Amino acid sequence: MTDIAQFSTGTTWPEIATDILAIEDRHTSGAYPKRPMAIVRGEGSRVRDADGRTYLDMTSGQGVALLGHSHPRIVEAIQRQAERLITCPEIFYNDQRARLLERLAEHTPEGLTRYFLCNSGAEAVEGAMKLARMVTGRKQILAAQRGFHGRTLGALSATWNPRYRDPFLPLLPGVMHISYEDIGAAERAISASTAAVILEVIQGEGGVHPASLEFLTAVRDLCSKRGALLILDEVQTGLGRTGAWFACDAMGIQPDVLCLGKGIAGGLPMGVVCWSESLGRMKEGSHGSTLGGNPLACAAALATLDVLEEEDLPNRSHALGERLLKEFGGANHPLVREIRGRGLMIGIDLRQRVTPALKGLMTRGVLALPAGPTVLRLLPPLIVQQSELDHVRQAIFEVLEEINDGRDID
């Protein structure tokens, strides 16, 4: 990795970091709990902070850096498109958008060939919920306990965590939550009033909990019988993350609507609502997104799809994940309650709070995420090397040993 340009002329690395942290703290919204580091450069699976320290990024920027940081194909596509045309709203046609829509139709689950392009996963969920109400004429939306679908008001209504919801009550009326994996609860709840059921195939924020084939099949059948739509939120699990192009494909579950986001544009903001041709078009003027489908993001998304295809990254994710899950599972560590996940989406459920482990990993040059109070979540870029995963695995075991021995890891 090449040297990072200095933040301000004539200052040393520590002063640069202090400048960045102080400025952000002085002006930030306060919405985010921040780690005491300033990331200023990224390349592949690694990022560098303003003090010159390098870290293996097992967060992928919260799942966004699907191809790693500053992938050369993404950088080239952005530079080339930025010289031609950056923005073009959907009231006009555009070549990059047309190419992307055509390419999406080659990969999204069979029959899902209508798309609304937006800027985030939460926006995609909002669009999916509006589409469901519009198409069915019904109001009720069913979501799952422990589920996470975003923090905008509609998406937040489908999100379960009371910590996120309670300050903003009342939320969208007509949204109810059922127990994840409870077929009986689904059968009782899905009715002639239900517009849609929205689920994650693997709950991410809720602790990396995969749904069983039995549960998803039952919900799919109930939706079909009772005229409700099945919306699958694959914002985090889609595009190779779980070892298949889409997690629902690997399980043979056909959604009516699919939500995408995070890494689809290689790091630029993009979300997509995908739905079945049988549902028809949205009514003109019923929805919109000023920046959605802009040529710059579309060019980056096209480059992302190219790399996913050419390097067969979904299958690579499957192979790397299988090995990593096996290695973690075979360790039988006393602090580990359970290992869950698929592909390169892995949750290590600890018998204690996860925060000390996250801090310990940072001191060893590894960045990871929580998924609830006790789960250590790994979302490495799909281009991660086996040697890097080996290093991460070793660092995790070292940190857990220190915690188990009662040693100070700060």
What role is predicted for each listed range?
Residues 2-410:
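Conserved N-terminal phosphate-binding loop of PLP-dependent enzymes in the Aspartate aminotransferase
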